[in-house]
Amino acid sequence: MAAIYSGIQLKLKNTRTPWPDKLKLARFAWISTQCLLPNKEQVLFDWTNHALTCFYNKKVEMPPEVVEGLWTYLDDILHSRKLHNVLSQGKTISLRLTVAQIINDRILDYTSGLRSVSFHTILSCCHGILTSPVLSVIYTAKYELLVQLLSRLCGLTSMQLRQQKYEEPLSLKAFEVLLVVLSNYLTVQKQQANSNRVFFQVTAHLLHPLLLLRHLLNTRVWTEKDDVKIRQNLSKEIRTKVDAVLQSALFLSDHLQSYKVEVSPSENEAGDRKSHIGKGLQGPLNTILTRICIHGASEEEEALFYAVKSNSLSLLFKFALDSFCRGGENKRVIFHLMAKLITALGFTDELDIDENFRASNWGICLLALENLLNSCLVGDIYNVAADRIQHGEVQFNFYRKVARLLFNNTQMGVPAWYRCLRALLALNHQILEPDLDELLSAVWVDAENMELRVRKAREALVSAVLQTYSKLRQLPKLIEELLDVVCRPAADELRPALLPEAIQKTLSQCLLDNPLRQNLEICGLILKRVQSCLLPHIQDETSDLALKVFSMSLLLHAVLFSFKTLDNSTPVPVVKQTLSLMTEMLKVVEDLLEQKLATKGPWMEKVQEVTLLLAHTWVEADALFQIHCTKYTSPSASQSSTLVDKALMLRNMDSPLGKLLQNLLALHKLKIHLLKSFSESSEMQKMAQFILNREELSVIHSLDQMWDFQFCNVNSSTYNAAHWFLVTSNLPLIAPYLDPNDRSVFAECMLKSLLQSLDASGSNLENTGISVCLISRQLLESPVLCELPEIFSALTKCIIKALFGLLDSSHMQLICPSFLTPPVENVEVKDEEMGMTPSMKRLKAIGLEMLYSVKMKSSVPLSKRQINGLLQLVKVTSVLNGYAMSYEDYLELFLTLLTLTSTIQCVEETNLSAFIELLKELFSVMASLLLAKNSQSILKVIHGSNLLEATMTTLFSRSSEGLFKSLDGPTWLSFLQSVQDFIQSLIRLIIDRKSSICLNLEKFTSFMVECNFTARVLTVDTGDLFSLQLHLVTLSALCREMMTTLGKNKQLDQALTHLLEKATAVMEPAIQAVLMGKGSCLLRQSFSVEVVTVMIRCELARASSSNDDGQEKISSMPFYRSFYQQILKELFPSPRPMDFLISSIHYLSAFHMAAEKTKVADLEDLHIEILQSIQALLSGTWMSLTDVKELEGPVKELLNQLMSNCSQEQFHLFLLMLREGLVAAKVEGGQCSEVLSAVTLIKLLACCLFPEHCSKAFWLITPQIISSLIFIIKESSKLPSLTRVLTVPGLEALTVLLRQGKAQISNPHQVIVVLGALQFVPLDSHCMEDYHSAFEAVHEALFAIIHCYPQVMLKASPTFLNCFYRLVSSVMHEGKQRSDTDRASEKDRESLLKCARLVERMYTHVASAAEDFTVLSSFMVAQYVSELQRVTLQPEIKAHLTEGIYCILDHCVEQDIKFLNTTLQMGVKEVFNELYSSYTHYHKSQRQGEEKYTV
């Protein structure tokens, strides 16, 4: 045999042996354990290497399949367990360098388009070599070979990334191999002794490929076709490795002197430059820039390479900053380096545009410039004083050149252009100050209306300018410059609004912090410009001039309405300055009001707008100053009202803004009258009517046009929204002075807008912006409307009128004529003698007419348009607050809805679904109205039983006519539910108001019993089950309400018991008819189960009210048992609807109670059967976590019922059942549903009330349960997919055990082990839902421990705080600021905010217990600031965490603060000092102030 096997080697070397045979022999030699070739592994490696080398050197020829087989053979060997075992034993095996070269060449061929063999196999071979420390020596020992491999792999992956438009999927293997190569290369690079050699190798071969790859990874638009592993993990890891390679190769500290020599412009460093020649790198920066400034072969490639260069320059500068500028050193070198990099973007040394620069590159160029300037800002390399004193303002002059570059080449449509200017402003405001007028013109006054991103960047820049000059206390200077720009001749008359919302908000904030004198100075400056620009030229009628003055008037209004008002503490000189300003302003307003403008047109409109705006500003400010400052006396108190009157006398006002300002002045006049002790109501009524302007409201259009609260944006399309907002926001002031006609017009306009809003969006309004529709909806839902009874009544009457307005009046005259008759016409002497008001007589007549119409089966036919119109009106009605309605309005609305429900009829079958929807909405609205306080008035108009009978008669009539035959199951069930809610609410009203309870209920029960018999006969004859189902729904509602009344009155109980017996007697045959009928498929199984459950509970209620043991009272027990058995069959074998499961569990609970009551023989078996069924249900593989959560409530109720009289044997059996599920091994075995079932039952069982013997048994084995749960948590936490499914429920069960066992768990070790389990719960899930559930579960467990076991918490405080720190750290990581593309959804942000609130809450609880371990307070603060230093938090997240840590700082004494300042590292110390400063300024002072008044 040895001879045979030894011949294998000879045959492999023999040139006559065919290559396919050689390959087979080689495979056999590797696999066979009996092949005893000496050093077999090395021999086979050498043979494979030789074969591949010969082929690729073209010394031999092979078929393609043999070449493919050789690579596959090599790959199989490299990844085999056998080779791994051989290498792990220390045996030396080596590959030849030619293999590495061949692999490198094949990668190059593939990138070039030559694809001869399976490239995936070659990459797999490369991966196998590099992941083996022994075999990877062929690359790591030859640095240049590894560089070549990395360069070619970068080219390969870059080629794949660039081919996105060809829709070819990315090769996962290529990126995996690239990451392995990068890791190996980084290790080898760090081991190189000669840093210059590394620099030249990287710049010559790797720099551009790596930067291109990084750029493509950053800018790729990832799609679902891309592999998730590449998108989420590999791309980030590769970018990190690339950064590490470049930074360590190009910016070593050893190279600093070389860079310094190259970029330093000083002549006195010439000697250093000469001495350095030959010692280090020559022109390293120039070498780098030469390598990255590559020109493309085409337009597309040229644009790509410029983008790579631009993005790379800011990255390289960041590397240089991190490497050379640690501790604030070498700032001057860094600056000169940055200057060179900025020049490399395509500019000359003087920062002019290079002749080869393309205009299309501006966007990318400005982004790079922005990043460079921001890095400069973050690195703090610009010290203004040092630059001016020591370096002759070198940096300042350079930044001035950058500013001029930006202004000379304005890119108004590029957001980065504005951000670059903002960065220069942040460096030093003096950089932009020489060009301040140009800046204000370009970005503020003359800026064009642009897209959202550009507008945001522009507004951010203007806001930054305002904030900067506010801090410098130079706002007057800035405003003066702004006024100069505004007053210049405009290139275009249509200038944008001077004060958009964002800029106005910033200006207001700046003015609040600004000294009052300066604010008054600003107002004076604006007023002087208005005087100089407008008054001398008022007859010139120049529209451009009017627009400018209007802009300045808006600015004056914004300034006066923004700074703090005068008060009694204001110094007298400031009051005098204010008085002088107000006097001058009054003079201007009066002069404008006295002007007589000859011609109409835009000029006149603008002048009137300016006049009214200044008048409104003056009277509001004057009134405010008078109210708050007694030192201030109005320039002319008598002239204030005269001024308003003159302004209101400006007629023929066509300008929308002018009309709005007149309304504001009228409102001011109304407020002034209200402040007086006596005022004429006629004058106030006149002002209120002027503000409302019912002529305009009656013809209002554009109800959905949005308005942004800005005066400058009030025009013909937005005026309606602005006017409606003014009216509604001041409704409490003007409503008392409106006559009925005004209120009616207001209500009609409001209803019209509400209906239009429903037409536009289906059922609800979109809460974006302010429009007439949105304002009306918000007013309808707000409590303000409820507090205005006249307006509310007008709206209710308007809705009633609209409901009848859609119907044919001739039909309504026949059915219910009293609706169309005013109340006064119904007055009769007899009624007056009886004390009945005309309105009550009318309403009673309506009720009688409605009952008569039902009896006579009268109807009103409806078209499709009428049905849709009524549906919209009913939806609006559903939002009305029934508690706010007057007695008469409530009754009229309810009777209107009831009449509609009883009489309307659908004439077209095509509209049937909309008609059923209308009926459903009508029943729902009536049910909600029955909950209001005036609901008892209904029973004074119509007897309760008559109302119930009329409703059911109509429904039975509709059913017999076949109205419901074509309905699908969900629609029919939804309709039944609305009917049931209404019937139940009405019966509850009869019972609660004690309105002849026995008489009404007995009459209605008898009516239903008689109708039930008729319906069953009809069902047998026609197969129509709808009437029968309506009977069952109604009888169920009737029985439920009667059951809730039992036990209050003995005589009443006897009557109700009789009625319950009467009702249940007919329900059993009815439900059996439904179950056997063909139409039962329309109903869900839950319907039948709920009905039978009601029947059982009725019988139980009757049995409980009787004196005997109840055995003979439950007569239908056989029927209930058969139903029970059917439920057990259908409960868990396969998926079932959730409503069926919930109703079935309720039925099991009721049936068990009935079984206990009747003392059935097999009660113990029944008990175990139910428990086994519930466990099997919860263990179902189809049950999701959401389903289990939804079933927890019903199952808890059932367990309480089962455990209340549980025997010791039954309880023991149940615990044994649970023990089988609490096995951690089942998690690994994939039986998670069984484990979840046991965990859920344990959690619910802990909340049950046990008999004493069961309670002792349960809490005795609780330590074992806790241990099992901990093992389950540990096992499930290994798989991220099980976090929410099993880990969190297990933790919730532990928390419940801790809370419920507060008095029973005495061993502290049982609590401490729970703390240990919390360490295993993963808090790094990619899914926010999983993260939030895990976070909340850990928090609740910690809260249970701190609340129920404070002594244990103190004993194990380090472990407790470590668990809590995991929460803090995770919420900081998740709550860090992210880019726009990586920003979380609104739902995720809300979940994260909840987590932050929980952390704040826990901090407060820890702080309340911190008095017992104050030593750890400083430790908690140190942990917090250390984590805070690493991330930039979202403001709302930071706010909650900061409030929480403040509570811990309350317990830090001075010694702790000194300790923290001493031990914390430099960066962390700065964060702590900032935190402690804000704590001292805001929180500590407030707390001390509160303590001052605390007893």
Swiss-Prot record:
GO cellular component: nucleolus
GO biological process entries: regulation of hematopoietic stem cell differentiation; regulation of signal transduction by p53 class mediator; ribosome biogenesis
Reported consequences of knocking out the gene: Mutants show a notable decrease in the population of hematopietic stem cells in caudal hematopoietic tissue and early T-cells in thymus. Compromised cell proliferation and excessive apoptosis are observed in the caudal hematopoietic tissue.
Nucleus found in the keyword field: yes
Pfam families listed in its UniProt record: Urb2
Biological function: Essential for hematopietic stem cell development through the regulation of p53/TP53 pathway.
Protein name per Swiss-Prot or TrEMBL: Unhealthy ribosome biogenesis protein 2 homolog
The organism's taxonomic lineage, starting at the top: Eukaryota, Metazoa, Chordata, Craniata, Vertebrata
